[in-house]
Amino acid sequence: MSNRKYFGTDGIRGRVGDAPITPDFVLKLGWAAGKVLARHGSRKIIIGKDTRISGYMLESALEAGLAAAGLSALFTGPMPTPAVAYLTRTFRAEAGIVISASHNPFYDNGIKFFSIDGTKLPDAVEEAIEAEMEKEISCVDSAELGKASRIVDAAGRYIEFCKATFPNELSLSELKIVVDCANGATYHIAPNVLRELGANVIAIGCEPNGVNINAEVGATDVRALQARVLAEKADLGIAFDGDGDRVIMVDHEGNKVDGDQSMYIIAREGLRQGQLRGGAVGTLMSNMGLELALKQLGIPFARAKVGDRYVLEKMQEKGWRIGAENSGHVILLDKTTTGDGIVAGLQVLAAMARNHMSLHDLCSGMKMFPQILVNVRYTAGSGDPLEHESVKAVTAEVEAALGNRGRVLLRKSGTEPLIRVMVEGEDEAQVTEFAHRIADAVKAV
């Protein structure tokens, strides 16, 4: 069990100006990371960021810390998280660092690391960095200080990588696509990828100003995208989150297509093409309709804990190549090393182009079960509501009523005193009533 002080499951994250996302902390983090990573040989670190205004401050602090430890920084400027993973691999850099808080508001930010092979840093390396942070900063000799430079063609390199994951024999020339880049890191990447593959592209959420990232746009709020798809009579819409590792789509009727549905389309197409190896990994929150649809195709399905980190771990454990969260993280290990919204979106588009089918029709083989989520706040320190007999009794009653055509999932939030009550089944009215019945039991504790 890890007892890390700063690193969570997705790096270090928080509100800018509050510990730990402060200039002095991030400078020391850069120094500590530099001290640990310098032991491994290479002296280059890739640094990318999303479009938050605080990214300028934090990349400068990181660079100063790395330089003091004798490592050189290569800046990409605003760049999707998966692009930093890719560039870290191709530059043979010792590590990649992403400054982003993903789908969070602009006033949050975070730092996460990739290893030389474009995967998450091992826990042992993160723990070594934390241990180094307990020491006083010491500067290497002046002749050994790190330098800083910019990768001027970073965007072009990543655009070509993305295009290479789309089959050469196919084209997007028959598609009108609305793309929503969340005023985030994909704003100068995704529209160009789609246009160069032949699509007629209408771009929204592509005017970042430092404070509008994820603000009523992007994968976490597709209302603007849905409206624009309908207004433009487009074939579909594609939305990314602030750092480009999630993708949510919208069909020509304005219906939202989530990560579960995208994985279903990609897995089914892989099966048809004889390219699917093993099964598919979802999470505890994956829709039961996904599990049943994959079962009908004979594709094995396994659930991991919520979090793309745990999806990847389960994929590696089973030797499978595809995994996803319903929030839009889709991991395709035959294509890349981490969740990549653009690459995942391209595989769905390839299925559309190859089969001459609409996104709506590709989704039709999977019946989504109504899934009701209720958040219940409880008093921290007052005991665990999930262990209370009354909550257990009501949960058991609901599970018995649903039988094998539904699910109940109760879990604590990892960041605040909330119990998340999820009930899933075939009848939306019944599922809603069941979810509120359990939520009321939790509130009464």
From Swiss-Prot:
GO terms for molecular function: magnesium ion binding; phosphoglucosamine mutase activity; phosphomannomutase activity. Gene3D superfamilies: Alpha-D-Glucose-1,6-Bisphosphate, subunit A, domain 3, Alpha-D-phosphohexomutase, C-terminal domain. The keyword Manganese does not apply. One of its GO terms (cellular component) is cytosol. Its EC number is 5.4.2.10. The keyword Disulfide bond does not apply. GO terms for biological process: carbohydrate metabolic process; peptidoglycan biosynthetic process; UDP-N-acetylglucosamine biosynthetic process. It catalyses: alpha-D-glucosamine 1-phosphate = D-glucosamine 6-phosphate. Belongs to the phosphohexose mutase family. This is Phosphoglucosamine mutase. It comes from Shigella flexneri serotype 5b (strain 8401). The gene is glmM.
